Amino acid sequence: RECITLKNVDLSNVTTTGDYAFFRCWGFTGELNMPKLTAPGKYLFRECKNITKVSAPVLENMSLYMFAECTALADIDMPVLKKVENFSFNKCEGLTKVDMPTVETVVAGAFSNCVNIATVNLPNVKSIGGTVFNNCSLITSISLPALQTFTGGAFSGMTGLTSYDVPLLATLETVPSSLFQNCKSLTAID
């Protein structure tokens, strides 16, 4: 934790980590390869500002704030990921897209303040939390064909959103609070 001069670490055999294990290790640069990681601790790589790519081929569930504020992170390789936890990628300004076809659950704030995300591919997401894409103003459309449940504020703060394809919304009898709060570009709700 806060080993700001630590430049690299061999994670090739690591399956589990404690909380804050590499929090603020600013010396980490380039790619993190975690071929066996299955149980990451909370805040694991938070504020590791120079990580550019992450590979975790067997990871199914992320941890809270796992890569939050990893501002250079641009490439994510997690081919079996099922769950993105609270604020896992908050303020990851290097991300320009979300391409996670295996993900089924995205929890509150997961991609909030990722200001350069422009495209989203989450075809199998069944559940999303609030403010998942808050302050992601470059996202103009979103498609969530498999969505089954969401919380209030699910699309809140998507200021560039102009259209959406979310079949579940057409079946609602009650609209949750803050569903489209601050979606300033949205002109119609079907």
Where are these regions (language model features)?
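Consensus positions within tandem repeat domains that build extended binding/scaffold surfaces
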Residues: 18-23, 41-46, 63-68, 85-90, ...
